[in-house]
Amino acid sequence: MVQMMRRATIADVAGAAGVSKTAVSFAFNRPDRLAPETASRIRTVAETLGYRPHPVARMLTQGRTRTIGILTPQALSVIFENPYFGAFNAGVATAAEASGYALHFISPLHGSLARAVNRATVDGVVAVGLSAHHAEVEQISVAGLPMVLVDSTALPSQAAIEVDDEGGARLAAEHLLSLGHRRFVVLAIEPSDRSDGDDPDGVPARRLRGYRAALDAAGIDLPREGVLTSVSTIPGGAAAFAETWDAGQRPTAVLAMSDAIAVGALRAARERGLAVPGDLSVVGFDDVELARIADPALTTIHQPIARKGEQAVELLLAILEGRSGPDQHEVLATRLVVRASTGPAPDAARRTH
């Protein structure tokens, strides 16, 4: 019978290197407590013996889990369905892996986000789409965990990463106005129970302000019935556009607060025999891969989603390591990307659908 090779222990390394077990521990966890040449020699001996420090032991020694929590108000099944979060999480993962950190997604546990937060063992948190006044955010602050808010309303004392939502929305509306459109519908992001959707400074509110600012400047009123909410998915966008069109509204332009909603509107328009952009123009927001492969390719507002995820993690690590204060606030630029889903407003003869 083949006998399994015994795993090297900290005592084996200490004996081979001629040092104490404490010195071996310092070499991996507190190298500043040893002379550089001693720490290097111990690590070389450990590598030769195939010794690896136990991760739990390292956590206890360092007081760190080397894990970052990603706090989201929606269930993971919803998060992973949304292409925006795919791009954002890719950026988060890139920055975390580069610094040797793991990720822990914190989403509602048995319907309770507070319970999930309470059970999370992490060094710091990136909170997405939650305002500073939400109970879970306050819970993290009280616990003293470093935190970066993303796409959220932050207090002056809190670190935050966001994009210029209002400016981007204004660009979208101005683009359609320049093409002669005068009849608009806005397909807004529907808030979850815990998101910042009802926050007057949350992402949906900022984007709506941007749309309204451009329309107001052009003398165009956007009535209450001209704003419908939708889950940020393709089916959600399709249902929202179908509702407005089937109710008798006849917009020539759709301002959608996400690319997924916009692509849903394209689908519903096609099902109703509308040509895009001949009869209807559609602008999204995000510029995810879905926008580029849509038919027709989607005009949208680009935001650096992956980079936003990277910067959120980089800022959190800087706070953890004392290289940045906890109150840094960064706003990333947005820009218009014109593709095939927008065109001149149809003339009066064609506005008879």
Regions found by a protein language model. Give the residues of each.
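Alpha-helical recognition/docking segments in bacterial nutrient-uptake
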Residues: 1-8, 55, 67-174, 178, ...
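Short beta-strand segments enriched in small/hydrophobic residues
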Residues: 23, 62-77, 124, 175, ...
